[in-house]
Amino acid sequence: MTPDDTNQTFLRRYVDDYCKALDENYKQDTIRSLEHNLQRDPECTYSANQLVEIMQGKAKLDKFRYYEGKKYIKVVREQYDEREDRWRDTTVHAFIGIAKDILGNVYKPASWKAPATKHVRYSFCKKADLLFLTDPRCVGWAGGYLSLIHI
């Protein structure tokens, strides 16, 4: 195994942890929202039922996964489609470089197929960024932390 293979193996693990952090952030944000709804309207059965499902681990909350391409890993948000009874990709959350010269660089998406490469938002090769990106309290499922104003 070459050093490049080793780096990409570690990167895949980090990206997996990144997706888990985004999942947890989405879950916590959903719980906060539902609890707020219940405070405003204690009779709201929808919010109460949703909270019970989340606590029991039965809720079909949005989740994040990634696809590997030639040059980038694409992190996407999946949503459960009740009518079709399946998960489907809804939005691109971020792109992460896997080519040698951009390894670990995190980019905001410009479109479904391409990143906005003008500015590197974070890098999995920097320890502080790695810790930030794998902490559900730091990343946000909606991607606001990827805007330049927050960097």
Question: What label would you give each PLM region?
Answer:
Residues 2-65:
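Negatively charged, low-complexity tracts enriched in Asp/Glu with abundant Ser/Thr
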Residues 55-98:
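Exposed beta-strand-loop-beta-strand "reactive/processing" segments of non-cytosolic proteins
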Residues 103-132:
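A short, surface-exposed interaction/processing loop segment used at functional sites
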Residues 129-143:
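Active-site-proximal segments of catalytic enzyme domains
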Residues 149-151:
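Conserved small/polar residues in nucleotide/adenosyl-binding loops
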